[in-house]
Amino acid sequence: MPIDTPLIPHKPISRYRSGRLEGLESESSSESDYEEVSDSHDQENSISSSRHVITPVFEKEGISETKTSSNFQNINPVQTIDNSASEYETDASSAEGGSNSAASSSEEEDSSDSEYEMELRRRTLLLPPKFTSKVIKNRAKANEEDTEVLKKVTSQKILEETIKRELLLKETKNNNELLNDIDDTDGIDPQSEYELWKLRHLLRKKRDKEKSLELEREKMAIEERRLMNSEEREAQDLKDAEASRRGKKKSSMQFLQKYYHKGAFYQNEDIVSKRDYSEATEGEVLNKDLLPKPMQIRGDLFAKAGQTRWTHLANEDTTKEGSAWYDPKNPILQKNLHRLGGLHSDSPLSKRKRT
């Protein structure tokens, strides 16, 4: 380990000189040398301590950074120590002291440089804060509000223009359709046109006459009903209901229509036996072919808990080759099919012979 502190020379033994004055001078000279060495040692300690407290100066507007002051560069404490020690010690001791002091000074310089670099890294160049006045802020806010208003106005104008354009296109399209629908075949065959008008005129007269007759019949029926009593009115109502029921033809079952079984009771009554059960009930859709495919479900189970994926047998193919119900290699299935009726030959049953 190199020694950080420099060697301090001890007070040398006074040499023999001829005369008392020479001895005193030598003693005084030795004492002065000792004082010079101690002063140089104190000065070196102050320099080493001051190197750790050097504040860096950042480059700004052409000002260069300085690591140490110019006063410390001119001082070389190693030389002072070596010169003072060489007067009193041998050549070997002076060489050893010089090497140790040089090593310690180089280590101090390295440590000071590293500390300086670390200090530079820690410190960051802080920019001065910029303060904006309230007037500028209010002006910026007003500009933003004006831009938003302009955007809204421009968007509204664009929307109005697009609506007007669409309306004009619709009008032109309608006008073109009307022009295409105009019948400009007048005067081609006047005789046939006259016959067609005559037929239309006769049909119009017939329709008007039928309406007038129907109104007269309704008026007569109202007058007759006013003259009837309560029993006659009930009998007339039953008669009209039966006539309307007979006039209706029984319709066939529609696609996915719910089936209502009429049962075996009250079949001797006409209201049960002659009723059409294929009519749609209240709230039931009659033509489910017009509905979308997900809504084509029997009954009113759409979007309910009882809805299943199976709709009707015509929609499901149960004759697939990979189906388990038609696997000829499955012995359990073949055994069950053999027990069912109508699935095997009509040969007579073979009776077992008694043994």
From Swiss-Prot:
Residues 24-37, 106-117 have a biased composition (Acidic residues). GO terms for cellular component: U2-type spliceosomal complex. This is Uncharacterized protein C1782.03. Residues 91-105 have a biased composition (Low complexity). It comes from the Eukaryota. Residues 1-121, 226-253, 336-355 are annotated as: Disordered. Residues 226-245 have a biased composition (Basic and acidic residues). GO terms for biological process: mRNA cis splicing, via spliceosome; mRNA splicing, via spliceosome. Transmembrane segments: none annotated. Residues 65-87 have a biased composition (Polar residues). It comes from Schizosaccharomyces pombe (strain 972 / ATCC 24843) (Fission yeast).
